[in-house]
Amino acid sequence: MKISRHAYADTYGPTTGDRVRLADTDLWIKVERDLTTYGDEVKFGGGKVIRDGMGQSQLSRDQVMDLVITNALIVDHWGIIKADVGIKDGRIAAIGKAGNPDTQPNVDINIGAATEVIAGEGKILTAGGIDSHVHFICPQLVEEALTSGVTTLIGGGTGPATGTNATTCTPGSWNIGRMLQAADAFPINMGFLGKGNASLPQSLEEQVRAGVLGLKLHEDWGTTPAAIDNCLSVAERFDVQVTIHTDTLNESGFVEDTIAAFKDRTIHTYHTEGAGGGHAPDIIKACGEANVLPSSTNPTTPFTANTIDEHLDMLMVCHHLDPSIPEDVAFAESRIRRETISAEDALHDMGALSMHGSDSQAMGRVGEVILRTWQSASVMKRDRGTLPEDKGDHDNFRIKRYIAKYTINPAITHGIAHEIGSIEVGKLADLVLWKPAFFGVKPSLVLKGGVIVTAPMGDPNASIPTPQPVHYRPMFGSFGGSRTASCVSFVSQAGLDEGIGEKLGLQKRLVAVKNIRGLRKSDLIHNNALPRIEVDPQNYQVRADGQLLWFEPSKVLPMAQRYFLF
């Protein structure tokens, strides 16, 4: 029996060689492989395959999956493939062909009476996003992040304190303890950064032992060469990451002095970008260093006609500046440069900027990490054309490059890639399911540890799930013991050794970060380019390996108003 490609895609989703458009962007994915078996696909529903004695076996719970996502189109850094995904005990247990081994060939994902099913036909499955630049200013940001497809938050803060409004630091063991206790209340993974601005090690060591997963150096606390050196020295001893927001005013040195203070040690440079802060005007040079793991944040990506206008007021509020003081205004204006903002998009597209975060409520938007990543990718395809690695009628390599920026690369950078960051066997089942037309904008389901935590849902009093008003609502995975069982808090190994879980009465599983020190940019996936960056000190023009990086700001974007009319 033969079936047309169109009819097959309507029934089981796209297969090898089919192309799928991402939302209303100019980006197209092409299915590289199909791990299901033609004629023996599994599908749930009345008159469908997953029934007793057909696609469902007689095997007991220990031999079958707890959950199977059928016929999903996986989009990850390692490939774009069609497959069934099996989940057991909250982890990804298999990627391949699901069904009943007694009646079907090539089955490596067993379905039984103990198995739940999510229909992935015609949908895209991605790993949950990781936002590695979060100001924990208000708890409500968790819901915004989850409903955008982000399942892990890394950053610092204690609420709407003046220090937190500006810096991603949770300072001191007492504050760290309170935030770890608060993390138990949320259906999302969290990890906290301590304050790294000190010239002697004791106060930093205390914070690492209190359970932070890393330390943050921020110019508002004084990012001097001495503080940088001391902080990195502590991090080397404890195998934690250091994130840095460098010295905009160049008071304690220039970008070359800061890079020298790194002493070739691994560091995650926040705001390696156009307007987010750090050495003016040339912090962007840091993305050409082999020991620097660079990221940028979403207020400047993609560069649009409105970007410059909104930035001055945002900056004045976030960094506690006074518009009546000329020096404060000059400080703010020195950070906002059209030329470096435009170059930021291009450096992302080249793979020179490796990660993308939000800078939540501190100039960035926590619910737009994924959205703006794909907007930027589409704009860069329009402005720079198809990448050399993409041959033919698809954008697979560009898509792998951009998805790595908010999944696997922040996971590698912060020592949590053994748990999350990709759709791979053994990792937590932190997964997001999308309709292609809404990809990157509005997820269909968000799973944490194999449990649905949020989804669009209609009127709870309706006779079916779909009647209006349909909006995101917390699901069962967001409540009670399920919440703490399906999520983790990432901490230092030193914190685990100190017994912080018992001391603080924490309910979430604590996972130690590891394998951080000694990382190089070459360890990051699809985003490890090391161009020679030059910034003209007079006109701020940016060149990478001699090529001018300038593109006009966009006036129209994909994934914008048509998706948010209601």
Swiss-Prot record:
EC number, UniProt record: 3.5.1.5
Keyword annotations: Cytoplasm, Hydrolase, Metal-binding, Nickel
Cofactor note: Binds 2 nickel ions per subunit.
A Pfam short name: Amidohydro_1
Modified residues (N6-carboxylysine): K216
Gene3D superfamilies, per database record: Metal-dependent hydrolases, Urease, subunit C, domain 1
Residues forming the catalytic site: H319 (proton donor)
Main location: cytoplasm
A Gene Ontology cellular-component term: cytoplasm
Co-factor requirement: Ni cation
Residues annotated for Ni(2+) 2 binding in this entry: K216, H245, H271
Binding-site residues, substrate: H218
Pathway(s) of this molecule: Nitrogen metabolism; urea degradation; CO(2) and NH(3) from urea (urease route): step 1/1
InterPro entries given in the database record: Amidohydro-rel (IPR006680), Metal-dep_hydrolase_composite (IPR011059), Metal_Hydrolase (IPR032466), Urease_alpha_N_dom (IPR011612), Urease_alpha_subunit (IPR050112), Urease_AS (IPR017950), Urease_asu (IPR005848), Urease_asu_c (IPR017951)
Keyword Metal-binding tagged: yes
Residues annotated as binding Ni(2+) 1: H133, H135, K216, D359
S-S pairs: none
Highest taxon of the lineage: Bacteria
UniProt record similarity statement: Belongs to the metallo-dependent hydrolases superfamily. Urease alpha subunit family.
Name listed for the protein in its UniProt record: Urease subunit alpha
Organism, scientific name: Nitrosococcus oceani (strain ATCC 19707 / BCRC 17464 / JCM 30415 / NCIMB 11848 / C-107)
Gene, per the UniProt record: ureC
